[in-house]
Amino acid sequence: MNAYQNKNITIIGLGKTGLSCVDYLLSQQANIRVIDTRKKPTGIDKLPQNIPLHTGSLNQEWLLESDMIVISPGLAVKTPEIQTALKAGVEVIGDIELFCRAATKPIVGITGSNGKSTVTTLVYEMAKAAGVKVGMGGNIGIPALSLLNEDCELYVLELSSFQLETTYSLKAAAATVLNVTEDHMDRYMDLEDYRQAKLRIYHNAEVGVLNNEDKLTFGEGENQARQTVSFAENSADYWLKTENGKQYLMVKDEVILPCEEVTLVGRHNYMNILAATALAQAVGINLDSIRTALRHFKGLDHRFQLVHQANGIRWINDSKATNVGSTVAALAGLYIEGKLHLLLGGDGKGADFSELAELINQPHIICYCFGRDGVQLAKFSSQSYLFETMEQAIEFLRPTLQSGDMVLLSPACASLDQFASFEKRGEEFTHLAQYSA
């Protein structure tokens, strides 16, 4: 008899992740109920008809009758109904915990405020180039539980702080917290509360890959890996060498690749490459395979992506910059011949925007602010314009563009005040950029 057979388990949240929990727990012969606080949740048409479903609110009676609750990462454990269930002795976990209990192959775990998806995909491509049967999922692509149905020798998981809050059995072969900057301050008490959720990835990890430029990423207490390696621009195991005007990606004294041979550009991307290389080497991927993957990797959509170039003007879609730290990373070390037309705005999730002030208060940077927190953002630039929508901002700036200029959507905010997702925001920007031709 398995651990879940005949257990009363309530799954909170439908969508792809919730449905993966349903499929997995049905295969384990559990008694399942599903709750979704939305009245018409996505995925409702894919739920087997014999599964009891409650929508529109949290059903406290169902929660208290459960042996276990599998909670969506989108719902805080601090929610009163969940706290009541916990106090009554009900176990509360997430889908990643279910996965970790079942997985028998090594796991690479990646978290951080920014760069998670790029690093996760890089490690996946490096493993593939080495001929490893590798599965990628978690907070990117397919739900982690769906990977159990695949023939994998290695799992590469992107993990959010929300997912890590309800994960207890992760024993990563290699893990990293790429960086810690303010994000989701509408859910966490403060930056330290958010950081502690991230650091859980190091609990029982074999190798921790540390960002030597960000001490907030260092493990502490029980959340420390058994061994550590580091990455940074200088003074680290994986580092960036500058010689005769050229930059090189290095591991100790060995050249990984000259930066000019990789398609990703920008200092923040070089740091992502170093972190990914460290993780890949920690699980036995050889440098030749790593080099092959790096030469072919084109980057991900909506991450500092060149979507249009004409008349000497570049349009860059960085819609995935949903927090201040991501926009700071995009702006750091950015060289522009002409003016930078920076599009900022959306839902700031309670973040402090003041870190942007020094970076954006430059003679060559003009800010175009929009969305829910556009007014707040506009205060930090002496050259700012305020609009209701991104489209209005672009139509305003379009006639002013000259050769050498860059239009950069790096909003420092989430998109949900005006768009269905950051992807939809990026797609609209791309459409408007290409319309300018």
UniProtKB/Swiss-Prot annotation:
The lineage of its organism: Bacteria, Pseudomonadati, Pseudomonadota, Gammaproteobacteria, Pasteurellales. It comes from the Bacteria. It holds the Pfam family MurD-like_N. It is found in: Cytoplasm. Belongs to the MurCDEF family. Cell wall formation. Catalyzes the addition of glutamate to the nucleotide precursor UDP-N-acetylmuramoyl-L-alanine (UMA). It catalyses: UDP-N-acetyl-alpha-D-muramoyl-L-alanine + D-glutamate + ATP = UDP-N-acetyl-alpha-D-muramoyl-L-alanyl-D-glutamate + ADP + phosphate + H(+). SUPFAM superfamilies: MurCD N-terminal domain (SSF51984), MurD-like peptide ligases, catalytic domain (SSF53623), MurD-like peptide ligases, peptide-binding domain (SSF53244). HAMAP family: MurD. The keyword Cytoplasm applies. The keyword Disulfide bond does not apply. GO terms for cellular component: cytoplasm. Its EC number is 6.3.2.9. Pathway: Cell wall biogenesis; peptidoglycan biosynthesis. It is an enzyme of class 6 (ligase). This is UDP-N-acetylmuramoylalanine--D-glutamate ligase. Keywords: ATP-binding, Cell cycle, Cell division, Cell shape, Cell wall biogenesis/degradation, Cytoplasm, Ligase, Nucleotide-binding, Peptidoglycan synthesis. One of its GO terms (molecular function) is ATP binding. One of its GO terms (biological process) is peptidoglycan biosynthetic process. Signal peptide: none annotated. ATP binds at residues 112-118.
